[in-house]
Amino acid sequence: MGLTISKLFSRLFAKKEMRILMVGLDAAGKTTILYKLKLGEIVTTIPTIGFNVETVEYKNISFTVWDVGGQDKIRPLWRHYFQNTQGLIFVVDSNDRDRVNEAREELMRMLAEDELRDAVLLVFANKQDLPNAMNAAEITDKLGLHSLRQRHWYIQSTCATSGEGLYEGLDWLSNQIRNQKANCNGTMLLWLLYPEK
């Protein structure tokens, strides 16, 4: 029993890992966000055909972030990345009022997938530095986020080029994974302390 409790505590305090899928319409800023988080700088990007994957270390959590291209022709491929996804980052170009309904349709289509039923949702309302950008409350309304009653979600205003808001979003994700692990480990600890006869 002592060895089992020792293993439990090492799991509680070990570095945690989280698989993140980052999607959104094309030109929303996904790749810029990924490399701002990874390198701390802006990199020149081209439209992503396929995916980029990087590991971002933050607050004792190793986030494996899959940035998948957003052009309409390759969106059907998004579903191939759903398996084992714990967190979904949906990036919205807050300045693109013409396509916010399209963004909503794509988001709702994804969230209906069984493989993503347990994934937490972080929405990055990106490009907040632009003068015509919709604020987080307006994006929340346009995407219909309040209708998501069975899912943990959060929206964060961001500016990928300056990095503003990105780490606040990662804070929310890290708290979500900590809470999930704590609930799971708490259940295991109760079972160890009070096993059924």
From Swiss-Prot:
Spell out the PROSITE patterns in the cross-references: ARF (PS51417)
Record lipid sites (N-myristoyl glycine): 2
Question: SUPFAM superfamilies this protein is in?
Answer: P-loop containing nucleoside triphosphate hydrolases
Query: Which BP terms does GO give this entry?
Result: intracellular protein transport; vesicle-mediated transport
> Top-level EC class, please?
hydrolase
Q: Does the keyword Protein transport apply?
A: yes
Enumerate the subcellular locations listed in this protein's record, separating them with semicolons: Golgi apparatus
Catalytic function, reaction form: GTP + H2O = GDP + phosphate + H(+)
Q: InterPro entries of this UniProt entry?
A: Arf1-5-like (IPR045872), P-loop_NTPase (IPR027417), Small_GTP-bd (IPR005225), Small_GTPase_ARF (IPR024156), Small_GTPase_ARF/SAR (IPR006689)
What keywords appear on the UniProt entry?
ER-Golgi transport, Golgi apparatus, GTP-binding, Hydrolase, Lipoprotein, Myristate, Nucleotide-binding, Protein transport, Transport
Entry superkingdom: Eukaryota
Q: Where does GTP bind?
A: 24-31, 67-71, 126-129
Q: Which GO terms describe its molecular function?
A: GTP binding; GTPase activity
**GO CC list:** cytoplasm; Golgi apparatus
| Enzyme Commission code(s) on record | 3.6.5.2
The family annotation for this protein states: Belongs to the small GTPase superfamily. Arf family.
Q: Report the NCBIfam families cross-referenced here.
A: small_GTP
Q: Which PANTHER family match?
A: ADP RIBOSYLATION FACTOR-RELATED
Function (record text) = GTP-binding protein involved in protein trafficking; may modulate vesicle budding and uncoating within the Golgi apparatus.
Which named protein is this?
ADP-ribosylation factor 1
* Organism for this UniProt entry: Solanum tuberosum
